[in-house]
């Protein structure tokens, strides 16, 4: 039997389903029943099918619901089938290795039997057992290690993180900090990442990496691993066609070239490696990017962007990175104690210190304010088991490896259980009240189903390249996405109707986008893929000019007004000149923070910062100053305004605001439940307001200081459907499939209804008396006419580009708007 799981076959199946559920088809059926009229009503009665005919629309909805399920199944089947070969390739070599070790054990045991008498050599057998069992354990550990390496980093797919953060599947402690940054069209930065479960040692010592240590490693079996900036490793296996297939990754693919390898993220970037696995070039789809050069021993020497920005790396005699310098001379210094990074001093003078335990892992992190921001305890597998914070709060982590559960005990004592599968993907989160969130994934670690704490499920589907193609919520509302061959978004459809369409040039730059009414925004790009001109649906246009480094130097808006921009060597805006020649200037510190803004009249607003980079004081243009103080957690403790009035803030164990004390000593207090939802508010005069919630976090009750309770109800996608006041008054709300409010029924039973166009814009309001007010829009989506029930109207007129020009009211009165240009008097 021929098995066809090509994309063409999948699309054919999807079209069959689409044809069955076509709105046109069902409209034809409905029209048919209406057209045949009374002549066949008797047949319906005799056949007892009148109810089915009357309910044809409801039946169509059932078919649509079934379509959602069928389409989801088709997407899932094809994704799963296409993943079979990939999954087989990804594990076969490791499983064969493990199996070979087991076979070797059997053969070795057989060799310990004396062929003459059948007796075993017990001493030899003991040695064989110890050696071969260790080999089997090592093979199994290699498989597990490969999976864990995929889950390193700040954003491991399918995993959740705690506050500091800790990976709630693997127990990995994650830390990151950006020490130096150069902005502009092609940003450069020195960004450090730490993974407690990363066993490798590099130029930053144990477990640390920086963002340009992306590298490629080829294994003996032909598998290629790509270590990303944050430490995560993605593996690519070579198939029979010689192509490298991502083991558990979406979108990216690896290509072998004569020079080495290229990692391609379609529509975004390309990373080139040499044969030794060193990253040589990182560039966008227009070829603009960063080049990397290395010392003879293979260590990174320089990262240089095409716009002239650069970072230079210097090492000590132990081959540890000790200095990073940008092209303007700003420097980051790194200090070590043995093989461990001890301190980092940034260009602004901020210092970050690290202390380690006997296991070589970070036990304390000291921030730039000389506050120990976290203290860590680990188990023997380098997993976090306890954390302590500056306010004395603690978090604990308990691991049930047999059942694949991690229990997090929060700072407020609440316990949340995270359940993971054999690939460390979070498949279930269990809360103290017994409610659960559930997750399903495809073979590329993409979530295909999420069920919330109320049992409501949202489903996602992806194409074979990993692009999201459909979401279906708990009320069967569908959003579909299509892409071109380079994974650029082509269209968005909601409930079967296309709402957005995009167009691209050969390089993948956006050249236009249009809505379902054909209103289009066109984009003209330069050779580097930068927008030069944007033309809107009304014919108005925006023009943009750039300097040689790719910075915007001139912007001509739709009204013809021109603003120009000046930059420093770090591509930071240092001045702007508006259409009236008013100049505003900006100054920065070594950490790229604005320290002063000087307006056209010479008035200055100044900012000062604490060592952690938070604003301490603002001296305004009028010379008056406002200030902030912070607690050890870095949260605002006091705010003093320009009049000297001070507001005080306190926080609970979960770092929620627990009280606010105003300058007049009026105090509001706040109490939260175990899910950090506000449940009690004490007002300055002593009154108390309480709140209740459902498992999804929707507010279901509010009781005011007088004891009056208002209740709220919601539908399956968390839209408010009913408000029940304390006096029994009831207000109900109804929505269409797009989520627009279409009907509001008040306590007296009076109905206000609403209609919308296909872009979700409200087109009419009909009051309880049946009088309708209508709204009409222009091609820019701005209201151009409001027609009232008595036939009168308000008319809005706009300039090109959408700026309001005039308003004419029903009584004939009007308003006109214009731009007043200021010209300096002649001397």
List each model region and its residues.
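Short, solvent-exposed loop/turn elements at domain surfaces
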Residues: 198-200
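Extended charged/polar low-complexity repeat regions
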Residues: 168, 196, 206-210, 215-824
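Membrane- and interface-active hydrophobic/amphipathic segments that mediate membrane binding, fusion
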Residues: 1-147
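Intrinsically disordered, low-complexity segments enriched in small residues
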Residues: 111-115, 119-196
């Amino acid at each position: 039997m021929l098995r066809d799981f090509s994309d063409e076959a999948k699309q054919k199946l999807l079209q069959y389903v689409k044809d069955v559920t076509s709105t046109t088809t069902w409209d034809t059926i409905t029209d048919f029943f209406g057209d045949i009229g009374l002549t066949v009503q008797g047949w319906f009665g005799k056949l007892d099918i009148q109810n089915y005919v009357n309910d044809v629309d409801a039946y169509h909805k059932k078919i649509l619901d079934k379509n959602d399920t069928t389409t989801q199944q088709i997407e899932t089947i094809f994704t799963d089938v296409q993943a079979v070969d990939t999954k087989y390739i990804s594990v076969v070599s490791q499983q064969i290795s493990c199996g070979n070790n087991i076979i070797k054990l059997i053969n070795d045991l057989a060799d310990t039997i004396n062929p003459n008498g059948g007796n075993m050599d017990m001493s030899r057998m003991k040695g064989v057992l110890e050696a071969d069992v260790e080999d089997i354990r090592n093979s199994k550990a290699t498989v597990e290690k490969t999976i864990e390496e995929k889950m390193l980093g700040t954003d491991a797919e399918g995993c959740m993180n705690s506050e500091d953060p800790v990976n709630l599947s693997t127990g990995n402690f994650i830390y990151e900090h950006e020490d130096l940054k150069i902005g502009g069209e092609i940003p450069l930065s020195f960004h450090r990442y730490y993974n407690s479960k990363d066993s490798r040692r590099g130029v930053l010592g144990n477990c640390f990496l920086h963002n340009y240590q992306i590298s490629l490693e080829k294994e003996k079996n032909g598998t290629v691993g790509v270590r990303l900036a944050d430490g995560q490793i993605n593996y690519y296996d070579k198939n029979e066609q010689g192509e490298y297939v991502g083991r558990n990754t979406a979108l990216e693919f690896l290509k072998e070239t004569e020079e080495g390898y290229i990692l391609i993220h379609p529509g975004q970037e390309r990373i080139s490696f040499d044969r030794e696995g060193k990253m040589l070039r990182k560039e966008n789809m227009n070829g603009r990017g960063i080049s990397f050069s290395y010392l003879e021993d293979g260590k990174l020497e320089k990262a240089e962007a095409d716009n002239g920005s650069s970072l230079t790396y210097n090492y000590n005699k132990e081959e540890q990175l000790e200095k990073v310098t940008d092209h303007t001379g700003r420097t980051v210094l790194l200090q070590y104690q043995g093989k461990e990074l001890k301190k980092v001093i940034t260009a602004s003078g901020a210092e970050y210190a690290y202390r380690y335990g006997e296991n070589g892992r970070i036990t304390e992190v000291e921030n730039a304010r000389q506050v120990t921001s976290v203290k860590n305890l680990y188990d023997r597998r380098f997993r976090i088991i306890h954390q302590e914070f500056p306010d004395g709060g603690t978090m604990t982590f308990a691991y049930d490896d047999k059942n694949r559960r991690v229990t997090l005990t929060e700072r407020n004592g609440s316990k949340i259980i995270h359940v993971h599968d054999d690939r460390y993907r979070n498949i279930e989160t269990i809360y103290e009240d017994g409610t659960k969130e559930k997750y399903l994934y495809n073979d590329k670690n993409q979530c295909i189903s999420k069920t919330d704490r109320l049992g409501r499920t949202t489903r996602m589907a992806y194409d074979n390249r990993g692009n999201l193609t459909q979401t279906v919520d708990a009320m069967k509302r569908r959003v579909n996405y299509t892409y071109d061959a380079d994974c650029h978004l082509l269209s968005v459809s909601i409930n079967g109707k296309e709402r957005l369409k995009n167009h691209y040039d050969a390089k993948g730059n956006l050249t236009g986008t249009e809505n379902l009414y054909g209103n289009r925004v066109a984009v003209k790009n330069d050779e580097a893929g930068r927008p030069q001109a944007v033309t809107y649906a009304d014919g108005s246009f925006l023009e943009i000019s750039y300097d040689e480094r790719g910075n915007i130097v001139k912007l001509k808006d739709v009204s013809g007004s021109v603003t120009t921009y000046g930059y420093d060597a770090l591509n930071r805006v240092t001045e702007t000149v508006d259409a009236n020649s008013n100049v505003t200037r900006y100054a920065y510190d070594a950490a790229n923070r604005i320290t002063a803004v000087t307006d056209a009249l010479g008035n200055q607003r100044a900012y000062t910062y604490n060592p952690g980079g938070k604003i301490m004081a603002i001296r305004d243009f009028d010379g008056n100053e406002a200030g902030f103080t912070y607690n050890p957690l870095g949260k605002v403790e006091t705010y003093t305004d320009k009049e000297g009035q001070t507001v005080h803030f306190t926080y609970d164990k979960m770092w929620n605001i627990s009280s606010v004390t105003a300058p007049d000593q009026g105090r509001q207090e706040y109490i939260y439940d175990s899910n950090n939802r506000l449940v009690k508010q004490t007002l300055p005069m002593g009154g108390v307001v309480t709140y209740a919630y459902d498992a999804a976090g929707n507010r279901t009750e509010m009781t005011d200081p007088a004891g009056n309770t208002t209740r709220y109800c919601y539908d399956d996608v968390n839209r408010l459907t009913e408000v029940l006041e304390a006096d029994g008054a009831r207000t109900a709300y109804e929505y269409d499939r797009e989520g627009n409010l279409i009907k509001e029924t008040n306590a007296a039973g009076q109905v206000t209804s609403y209609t919308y166009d296909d872009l979700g814009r409200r087109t009419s309001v009909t009051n309880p008396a049946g009088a309708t007010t209508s709204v009409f829009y222009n091609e820019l989506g701005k209201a151009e006419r409001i027609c009232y029930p008595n036939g009168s109207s308000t008319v809005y007129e706009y300039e090109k580009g959408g700026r309001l020009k005039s308003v004419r009211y029903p009584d004939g009165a009007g308003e006109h708007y214009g731009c007043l240009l200021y010209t300096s008097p002649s001397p």
